[in-house]
A protein has these predicted regions:
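Structured, mid-chain assembly/scaffold modules that mediate subunit interfaces
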Residues: 1-136
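Extended, charged amphipathic alpha-helical segments
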Residues: 123-185
Length: 185
């Protein structure tokens, strides 16, 4: 525990403020998709920027006893008439070492992945190394995993489900009842 007013305390307070600024977006996307990540990324200063990784932007590739151990994320962007997809794979091995791999693809349309190009093809990805394994055990994916609701009451799988999923049948029944009542009166 740190004393108030130290440099580390001020830095942590700044990070907490940055996370607080993202919490509404995080909560909304996690409720819609059932789960998601809050991902820290260097912003070019001494701070981290935090980004929401929505459920439709990643695939879980493996799980271990303590949660997700392998995930593939995608980020889409457009430059001129080309469509770019950055694939980021984060894998944690059995000893807790985190490896991050990046690949960039370009396509002439938004419906195909296209072919692989160099990471420096787009300026925002030029500083990324194609692969990096941390030299000390990281113990996780380096992101905060958030899941709402905690229990999957739809199919019992380890995947998250939208908080709205359980209400779908109820909403259909309400519409049906309203339709029937509207026809009678």
């Amino acid at each position: 525990f740190m004393e108030n007013g130290t440099g580390k305390t001020a830095w942590l307070d700044g990070q907490r403020s940055l996370i607080d600024a993202e919490k509404q977006d995080v909560l909304q996307w996690v409720m819609v998709g059932g789960e998601g990540f809050l991902k820290p990324a260097p912003d070019g200063t001494e701070r981290l920027a935090y980004h929401v990784v929505r459920r439709d932007c990643y695939n879980v590739l493996a799980r271990g006893p303590r949660g997700i151990t392998d995930v593939l994320m995608s980020e889409r962007s457009r430059a001129g008439s080309d469509y770019y997809t950055l694939l980021e794979r984060r894998t944690v091995d059995g000893s807790g070492y985190l490896t991050i791999r990046y690949k960039l693809y370009v396509s002439e349309n938004s419906s195909t992945l296209g072919h692989e190009v160099r990471l420096d093809s787009l300026p925002q990805y030029a500083a990324l190394a194609p692969e990096h394994t941390y030299s000390v055990p990281f113990g996780g994916l380096g992101m905060t995993y958030i899941r709402l609701p905690m229990a999957n009451n739809v199919d019992g799988s380890p995947d998250g489900v939208s908080v709205y999923e359980g209400a779908v049948q109820l909403i259909h029944n309400i519409y049906k009842n309203e339709y029937q009542l509207g026809r009678e009166f």
